[in-house]
Amino acid sequence: MVYFVGAGSGAADLITVRGMRLLQQAHVIIYAGSLVNPELLQYAKTDCEIHNSAKLTLEEVLQIMQEAQAQGKMLVRLHTGEPSIYGAVREQMDALDAFHIPYESCPGVSACFGAAASLNLEYTLPGVSQTLIITRMEGRTGVPEKESIERLAAHQASMAIYLSTGMLRELSRRLTAGGYAPDTPAALVYKATWPEEEAYICTVETLAWVAEVHGITKTALVLVGDVITHGSYQKSRLYAADFSTEFRQAKSNATQTEEKQEKQCED
């Protein structure tokens, strides 16, 4: 049995409880050594067989999986962040299907959510944005034209842009070409939730400058949108007094006034 486990965004204690237990039970672990916090390997058994996939090809990873299955061993494939986002897991799953090897997935905390926690952000502020776009610049892996930065920027939604730290000048140019103003709030978060995390609030126009000043060349996430400065937004209707839910009846203006008067009398 193979388990694809999300390691979380960086901090070792951000792995899920289920993910931690799977690591504790595994006979074999293949981890993404270039990005996964090595502290997570402390959960492994003393006799666990551990492989660093940064040094392996896809074929070599699959060979280890086949050998573990043949020996009746449980294997954890430990991916950085959340495996379903830029995790290259589908090609492994398709191969396992061909080999008739069963597998399951265990989610993890992706970097965009780790970064939001570090900055105390809400991506979906009423009156500002109700959409989060997760994307990347094209590099050695292409991006469909319909998902270009310019087309996505036209939505003026909150954006989390992965794998683009080395292309920040081009990214800024394309974001503004798509409709963002140069002074639109942005953030550059290096190694979100890791002990060495660095986070900087800037603008779309100053992204590259901030990276250069602080020597950030890789492993950073770019966030874009007015939610970053949260200066003007509407309160959620969910907790409004005149809003009914399954658990609470709306109060009329008269009822609210009476309650205020009663409270004033009590005071």
Task: For each feature predicted by the language model, list its residue ranges.
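A generic local structural motif
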Residues: 14-18, 38, 62-64, 120-121, ...
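A contiguous loop/helix-start segment that scaffolds small-molecule binding in enzyme catalytic cores
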Residues: 2, 60, 71-75, 131, ...
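Active-site catalytic pocket residues across diverse enzymes, especially alpha/beta-hydrolases
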Residues: 44, 119, 175, 179
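Class I SAM-dependent methyltransferase SAM-binding "motif I" and its flanking Rossmann-like core
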Residues: 11, 82-155, 198-201
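Structural recognition of alpha->loop->beta junctions
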Residues: 26-27, 95-102, 126, 207-216
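Class I S-adenosyl-L-methionine
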Residues: 1-109, 114
